[in-house]
Amino acid sequence: MGRRPARCYRQIKGKPYPKSRYCRGVPDPKIRIYDVGMKRKGVDEFPYCVHLVSWEKENVSSEALEAARIACNKYMVKSAGKDAFHLRIRVHPFHVLRINKMLSCAGADRLQTGMRGAFGKALGTCARVAIGQVLLSVRCKDAHGHHAQEALRRAKFKFPGRQKIIVSRKWGFTKFNRADYTKLRQEKRIVPDGVNAKFLSCHGPLANRQPGSAFLSAGAQ
């Protein structure tokens, strides 16, 4: 008996059904890697960011996420280089899909049990996606922005429904706009923290600050 097509589980029905001590025997999801490329590059290295956003409320299978990751990664490595981008999968397949196996071949009518015990057994996993939720994100340099958009366009064919490619106005994966990030970085009010950045607010101990100034000046070391 082959794998049931994912179109049978596309619509979101009922409550989430995650893996737990009551829901055992769940197959491992097909996607195991969620960060691809130069994931250790600092926040200042890749200012450009583009997202693949879902425009429907639906279930996305783990097989589709893995296929999209492979397609996007393959094009970016071929066109921009393996050291020129950071791809991140933004959704995780935590919802468990069930199947009530029914033998439909000839001569199998004596083996079927109909609707007796029809709750079903675990078949696979999927991600429950809302409208406007980000599926994939790519950060890179400005020179490779068109390659990132083309990579997400190719990955879009692996998903059901409608998706949109949106160029972010933020700096990389941070929450700061590009103009604000540059300004705050010059004022030393932002500290790089891996792929993200920490904002230094007015709160906290004042032991290391000069009297009369809440922040250190840009020229101070």
Swiss-Prot record:
UniProt-listed InterPro entries: Ribosomal_uL16 (IPR047873), Ribosomal_uL16_CS_euk_arc (IPR018255), Ribosomal_uL16_dom (IPR016180), Ribosomal_uL16_euk_arch (IPR001197), Ribosomal_uL16_sf (IPR036920)
PROSITE patterns the record matches: RIBOSOMAL_L10E (PS01257)
GO biological process: developmental process; response to UV-B; translation
Sorted UniProt keywords: Ribonucleoprotein, Ribosomal protein
Gene Ontology molecular function terms on file: structural constituent of ribosome
Top-level taxon of origin: Eukaryota
Pfam assignment, any one: Ribosomal_L16
GO CC aspect terms: chloroplast envelope; cytoplasm; nucleus; ribonucleoprotein complex; ribosome
Keyword Cytoplasm: no
Complex formation: Component of the small ribosomal subunit. Mature ribosomes consist of a small (40S) and a large (60S) subunit. The 40S subunit contains about 33 different proteins and 1 molecule of RNA (18S). The 60S subunit contains about 49 different proteins and 3 molecules of RNA (25S, 5.8S and 5S).
Stored PANTHER family: 60S RIBOSOMAL PROTEIN L10 (PTHR11726)
Family membership noted in the UniProt record: Belongs to the universal ribosomal protein uL16 family.
Protein name, UniProt field: Large ribosomal subunit protein uL16y
